[in-house]
């Protein structure tokens, strides 16, 4: 069996210290700190007051307003990073075999903000008022699914959920898919958006977050 060489041809990201690889690297090199006071919710009742929020996410570059209604924030982050990676790689999807192009993008939790919002909505307005897109927005595999739909990839499409190792496992699985000839191209990585009451509150209850 001939094993294929596997290479990284492009990369993209959104983070508290940059939304392009160049910006991220320069800020990292210069010692810029992306951790700061939590602004997304009132955290006065818990001892955790700092987090790595993304304040300048360039939503308008790839999305329209209705995308917020059908995708959780973590999916938007994942799609943005993917499209940036394709641009970085100068990869035209019309030049690849879409049936041999896959997406393995993981999330440890998935659409946690949507889960929180809909649970509150249910308690305030009743079970019949849960919004139809709740499940598609909340599922942890929907970042991968939304990416595949956006770029037209028809190969493997999955999410590997292994807590904090989820993205690392996705990259390893992508390596295997290409190495052994199952696919030619894999978009691999991970995304998360859990800076909210239930996310920070939950990890605080676990005593897994710094209080300084």
Where in the sequence are the language-model features?
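Acyl-thioester C-C bond-transforming condensing/cleaving domain
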Residues: 2-3, 16-19, 30-36, 87-99, ...
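ACP-dependent fatty acid/polyketide chain-elongation machinery
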Residues: 1-67
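Generic anion/oxyanion-binding catalytic loop in active/binding sites
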Residues: 13, 71, 160
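Generic hydrophobic secondary-structure packing signal
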Residues: 23, 74-81, 166, 170
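A glycine- and small-residue-enriched flexible loop/hinge segment at structural boundaries
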Residues: 40-91, 140-154
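Short loop/turn motifs enriched for small/polar and acidic residues
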Residues: 106-108
């Amino acid at each position: 069996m001939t094993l294929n060489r596997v290479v990284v041809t492009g990369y993209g990201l959104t983070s508290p210290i940059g939304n392009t690889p160049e910006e991220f690297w320069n800020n990292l090199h210069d010692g810029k700190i992306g951790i700061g006071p939590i602004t997304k919710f009132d955290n006065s009742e818990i001892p955790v007051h700092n987090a790595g929020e993304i304040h300048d996410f360039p939503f308008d570059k790839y999305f329209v307003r209705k995308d917020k209604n059908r995708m959780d924030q973590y999916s938007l982050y994942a799609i943005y990073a993917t499209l940036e990676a394709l641009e970085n790689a100068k990869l035209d999807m019309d030049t690849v075999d879409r049936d041999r192009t896959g997406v393995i993008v993981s999330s440890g939790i998935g659409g946690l903000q949507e889960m929180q919002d809909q649970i509150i909505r249910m308690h305030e307005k009743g079970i019949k008022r849960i919004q139809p897109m709740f499940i598609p927005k909340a599922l942890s595999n929907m970042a991968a699914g939304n990416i595949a739909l956006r770029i037209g990839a028809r190969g493997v499409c999955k999410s590997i959920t292994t807590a904090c190792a989820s993205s690392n496992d996705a990259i390893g699985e992508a390596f295997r898919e290409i190495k052994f000839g199952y696919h030619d191209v894999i978009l691999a990585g991970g995304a998360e958006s859990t800076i909210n009451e239930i996310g920070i509150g939950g990890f605080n209850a676990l005593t897994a977050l710094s209080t300084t």
